[in-house]
Amino acid sequence: MLRVLRQVGDVVNKALKYALDLVQPDVPVLEICEKVEAFIRANDARPAFPVNISINEVAAHYTAKRGDNLLIPKTGLVKIDVGAQRDGYIVDAAVTVALGPVFTNLAKAARAALEAALNTAKPGIKAWQIGDAVERTIKNYGFNPIYNLTGHKIERYLLHAGYVIPNYPDKSAS
């Protein structure tokens, strides 16, 4: 199982890097999604869900549909969420890209919040404590977290397996 997860994780990592190369102004979002999903399939995995590319005020989970005319903007905040699976073992990861200097600090805040979460996560730590680290980091950059998005547990064949990690110190998520 661990070997498969590492292999699929490598596919997701490479797929995200590939997606970053494709994110250019005026490129159709659907085209990027289709190319990234084809990349995943070409690397002996299957998409765990449709590639999500969310722009600006759309915080997450935007899925381009056939005929979608949405283009990557010249300036903006682009979030790319990719998941792949093999034999039901799922890996899910996302990255935030700043297009233009206006959004650079927000993208840095997102990355720093992820690093704070990873540095806080240890055996015995409660989910709310990770959320506290995330919220403090984001607020240090002058932003507020999105309260209705969370990290989530993944199980075999199950992308959202119940256990969540909030972006703020929600003690009900312990």
Where does each model-flagged region fall?
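Active-site neighborhoods and metal-handling regions in enzymes and metal-associated proteins
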Residues: M1-S174
